[in-house]
């Protein structure tokens, strides 16, 4: 099985790039993987496991792409990393892996920041959310609504799933939310995370908490956008009487570095907070290994499971998380919850409790490590992924018919602004010589004529061509299998000569099960 893998690749500053790096070894044990990227640079170490192909949207190498059994598209809400991947998925149906359940940021980034397509964005919002969605889209475009509000109210997940042959999510909660609306097979598999990075407490065989301190080391890391709640953390520390007993280290790209630096200065936290920015993975792993407590808040949440949370547990670190989305489903013995409506108060309460009972928090990290080892193994994830690919492949003929029906419906809608079923019934009545009003149906629709029938006929012929092409491809594959079977049953004479009497018996037995001779 050959799979195309469209994903950010290291050293891209993306947790999904790290996910690909960690999974690649297990993945290549189960399938032939072709990595696809529009990045100019990638970690050469990846090429020890898989071929790396580059692409440009304007010049897609479709013959090479079409060699694979299935294409797997990794979709998240960062337009820089996933915009091109999503665009390829619209032109070449495959399996969508959703790394975020709310994709408003992805599409807002494409339509507003990259394409400057206001009307396209508003039409998209109206298509999925009606007039209210369009009006809020207007307000967002004009700066009257925030992207956080839009992501919470209007996820636009359906837009990414529309052309897919299959969808894979990483949490039971996401699966339950999408199962009734997904237009194709939907699968669920917990995120994989099994590699113990060099320098981690787990790699050293030591799950015990860092014995040093005070000051105790707090850590926040990853792609730091506004929903990571840094301002609330800063304010909680600024008003905490024993702030000198903590040091907060922030690693990762910041959405507004200057603003956050000003907040640190305004709150007089220069001796407590350090903004490190993006650092190499080895530096981050060393920081995690020496930390005492991780802060992994997200509000609003984008809905899916968190690679960074698995990375925290991989270091047996206790963590504070927001009680929303996937995080809310985590066992209470593994994380310390922070309520969105009481953020500052809850953060301070946990800091106070940590100073009083550090070992209670250390046990949370140890329980998290055991949870990762049990529920997030790469082997189980790869098997679930392969099963999802098989389901998607089986769905392919239905997807062609569904796509055709959607195109017909869109065409009919433009004719009369009436449901496609009404239009089809009216045209059928005209062909059969019947009238709707006499048959108890809808009144005959004005403006329809035989030109519209010709359009439908053209669409039908296009579908027929697609089906015939699929049949030709299947036929070629079957012929190749048949030829291979024939060669196995009836090898050339020079091969037979070297096999002696043992071959004669094997050859005789195989002959009984072989298909009829393959024609020359």
Regions found by a protein language model. Name each.
Residues 18, 225-239, 258:
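A conserved mid-protein helix/loop that constitutes part of the nucleotide-sugar donor-binding site
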Residues 69, 165, 288-303, 317:
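Acidic donor-binding loop of glycosyltransferase active sites
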Residues 168, 211-228, 249:
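Conserved donor-binding/catalytic core segment of Leloir-type glycosyltransferases
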Residues 247-260:
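Glycosyltransferase donor-sugar binding loop
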Residues 260-282:
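Nucleotide-activated donor-binding/catalytic signature segment of Leloir-type glycosyltransferases, i.e.
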Residues 369-491, 505-510:
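C-terminal amphipathic helix plus adjacent low-complexity
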